[in-house]
Amino acid sequence: CIVKDREYKVNLKMNGMFSVYNVLAALTTALALGMDIEKSIKTLEEIGGVAGRFEVIVNKPAVIVDYAHTPDGLENVLKAARDITPSDGRLICLFGCGGDRDNTKRPIMGEIAGKLSDYSIITSDNPRTEDPVSIIEQIEVGMKRTDGKYKVIVDRREAIAYALDHAKKDDVIILAGKGQETYQIIGKEKHDFDERVVVYKHLNK
């Protein structure tokens, strides 16, 4: 970054352009508060990744957990993932949309996934009191506006297993929507569900 005609190099431990924008915003705030720029940069360089935010949990294939649950969030994470996807690998997006929440974003997110992923798996993400199949059908409306290839697997655990079983070593799998959450809300009940644990258990069967 350049501050008052002087160039500074910042080495981040975080991935994605959205992390760059966040760091630039933090530095701008630090400058406005009169803080030392070099000390601020050193502090930012020491910050590790945030749990559930572009969190790489395994490699070959890369499996990344991210909280992206809005159109903007999904677009940003898929663009960041595309940057690290090998030329002979596929970008696979597994996602759903929350129940009893804004339903207008569902087709929008379907369209984004269809355009930016090589393959999508549409599944459940805290359906709450809504019918998960109905939520998925609304997502499909947007997906069908694209040429994107996709599969519907309502049960999220089964969807993750399918993604892992069919991925090749150079593929990148994005598990979008839950991030750091350790539960799945079905009806009015919270069920234990940590995607990291689901992935580890499946790979170590």
Feature annotation, model-predicted:
Residues 15-18, 191:
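Short alpha-helix boundary/capping segments
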Residues 1-9:
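Acidic-glycine-rich active-site phosphate/pyrophosphate-binding loop
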Residues 3, 14-16, 97:
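Non-catalytic surface loops within mature trypsin-like serine protease
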Residues 25-52, 56-205:
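ATP-dependent carboxylate-amine ligase
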